A protein has these predicted regions:
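N-terminal catalytic or cofactor-binding beta/alpha core of small enzyme domains
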Residues: 1-138, 149-150, 156-160, 167-201, ...
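Local beta-strand/beta-hairpin segments that build beta-sheet-rich folds
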Residues: 6, 208, 212-213
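Short secondary-structure boundary/capping segments
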Residues: 205-209, 274
Length: 296
């Protein structure tokens, strides 16, 4: 992916950072890091310490591994908000935390969808994934991935498609400017429930103008219920972290939640509704979301 970007001659060689090659143009930087991304915590602060440049957003260009082995291009936020502080995350990050999702997350997804039938990737699917794995950092982040096995990680067509998406997404930043923010009435969507490939978010974030925050699958919302009916478990912590981090990515906007209701048991839904009501967070369906995007 990175080589495909460099091949477009948009980015020029710059000064190595931490001994690793870097490239630059306008306000965009490309950093070739050795090894795995997942355990590289605080890359934003490390970059700033070495260059003096404050990091606005981090897009990780990465491989994606899946047991299914199906060829796919995926994008997702990062974090492990559902883990207790005494748990060791199996794939990086800091337990009970999540960086803000990239404010460009929905735009990345919408741009990727344009290439769903691209002849360069006839065998590939495209999809969002829910929030998962590390690394940890303060700046917003998203992973842009090629999956799902060694047979497809080096696929030239997939790398070219991602290069197209990134250059289109960052065209203003490559020229030294900034992409204008969307209308102020548009809320940030957080989704709760469903499976790993975020079917609800795939649909809702595809709409023009949509903004997307964290997405938590059922496996990241662990519920427990006592014999007396009281509900506990790290699900509430995970929800709070996802909401707060999504708001941090879009500090002037409202955050709304959409639930995959059928994926929860009745008592889990009630606990979620009560918790979100206590936080004054609106729960919406797809029709309401469309109305919100249309404007007041």
């Amino acid at each position: 992916m990175a080589q495909a970007l460099i091949g477009r001659q948009e980015l020029q060689p710059s000064v190595p950072v931490e001994g690793a090659p870097s490239y630059a143009k306008g306000r965009v930087r490309l950093w070739f890091r050795p090894g795995f991304h997942l355990d590289q915590d605080d890359l934003d602060e490390r970059w700033q310490a070495n260059t003096g440049e404050r990091v606005e957003d981090v897009l990780f260009l990465s491989k994606h591994a899946a047991a299914s082995g199906r060829p796919c291009l995926t994008v997702h936020p990062v974090g492990v908000p559902h883990l207790n502080a005494d748990e060791t995350p199996p794939y990086g990050g800091r337990s009970g935390t999540a960086p803000p999702p990239s404010p460009r997350l929905a735009k990345i997804w919408q741009s990727l969808l344009v290439h769903a039938d691209d002849p360069r990737i006839p065998e590939f699917e495209v999809s969002l994934e829910v929030t998962h794995h590390g690394p940890s950092q303060k700046a917003p982040a998203a992973f842009l991935e090629v999956g799902s096995t060694a047979d497809t990680w080096g696929h030239e067509g997939a790398a070219d498609v991602w290069a197209d998406v990134i250059i289109s997404l960052l065209k203003e930043e490559l020229m030294g400017g900034s992409t204008p923010a969307g209308p102020p009435h548009i809320p940030v969507l957080v989704t709760l429930g469903g499976g790993h490939y975020a079917p609800r978010a795939n649909q809702m974030a595809a709409l023009e103008g949509a903004l997307l925050g964290h997405m938590l699958a059922n496996h990241s919302l662990p519920f427990k219920r006592n014999e007396d009916g009281t509900v506990h478990g790290p699900w509430a912590q995970a929800v709070d972290v996802a909401l707060d981090a999504s708001r941090a990515a879009h500090p002037t906007r409202d955050v709304v939640v959409s639930l995959d209701r059928k994926s929860f048991r009745g008592w889990e839904r009630r606990a979620l509704f009560d918790h979100l009501e206590g936080r004054h967070v609106q729960v919406i369906d797809t029709a309401t979301h469309r109305t919100m995007l249309d404007g007041p």
